Amino acid sequence: MAKINLVRIDSRLIHGQVITKWLKMSGANRIIIVDDELAKDDFMSIIYTTAAPKDVSVEILSVEDAKKGWMENELGNGNLLILFKDIKTCYELKNEGVNIENIQIGGLP
């Protein structure tokens, strides 16, 4: 069972502040981005995956895949930083039963 260390809503997803401050502060060793559009975009997925430090794994999941991962084994192992591009997606996943207790709001359009 993974431990959700930080849930952040930020339209920029992985960027300097997330990597230099929030990743270290949260102690996460895995980043999960939940976004239906990004999960279908191989090129942008590579961009976001390579933006993280080499010792941090990045997974990009659709809402449905994140829900399945939570129901099957609570998203596996490790300490998680879960990123959402918008409030709607975070709300949708919480309503599907994912244990989101606290949410940090970052840059939104």
Q: Can you annotate each of these PLM segments?
A:
Residues G78-D86:
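A polyampholytic, Gly/Pro-enriched intrinsically disordered region
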